Amino acid sequence: MLICVTNRKLCKDDLLTRIAQIAKGKPHGIMLREKDLTVIEYEALAFVVNKICKENGVPLIINQNVKAAIKLKIPDIHLSMDNLRSFKNELELAGFSQVGASVHSIEEAKEAERLGATYLVAGHIFSTDCKKGVPPRGLQFLKEVCESVTIPVLAIGGITRNHIDEVAGTGASGVCIMSEAMTCANPAALVNQFRF
């Protein structure tokens, strides 16, 4: 399972072109991160990205912006633990089909599952420029998260092709990649390169 996470600041070319190339490779989802955009800017971008994703049969995952997901009728959302706790009632009312949560401890993983998350993203597993100066949590942490819940767990943070076997050995269901997705030479080939 592969989820590609956007970050236009890492993207060396046009973000929409790159998203279209990634979507052609059919990952399990494309998560629209872009946390620094205003709500209006995010909604406008999500509208266009959703069209690209639909054309390619790839789910768009809205990151954090519950109101945009509801407004655009996008059924997949990814939340921080704080937002998962805050929006629990709204999530139930909105009827999202997939609710992901970012977790950084075993306790958070268990809580997220109790609150209704359908999958978890655990990290950061390896060193990454996105979290400079913060030590990675490592494979043992990932294994413990996987063992503590019954829902799928994806690894994030410093994931490269060279890590796939190690990550798969922890019981994880897949990976989320951002830097590689935004900078690689052949975005359409990512799914095959990160296959478990």
Question: Model segments located where?
Answer:
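Hydrophobic faces of well-ordered beta-strands that scaffold small-molecule active sites
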Residues: 2-6, 30-32, 60-62, 77-79, ...
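Conserved, mostly hydrophobic/aromatic
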Residues: 4, 22, 30, 69, ...
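Glycine-rich phosphate-binding active-site loops on the catalytic face of alpha/beta enzymes
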Residues: 4, 81-90, 121-133, 161-196
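Short, acidic/polar
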Residues: 9-23, 64-67, 104-111, 160-165
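Structural motif
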Residues: 22-25, 72, 94, 115, ...
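Glycine-rich, proline-tolerant flexible connector loops at the mouths of alpha/beta enzymes
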Residues: 31-41, 124-131
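Alpha-helix-loop-beta-strand connector modules within alpha/beta enzyme cores
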Residues: 42-64, 81-84, 88-105, 133-161, ...
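Histidine/lysine/aspartate-rich catalytic loop segments that bind and position anionic ligands
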Residues: 102, 106-131
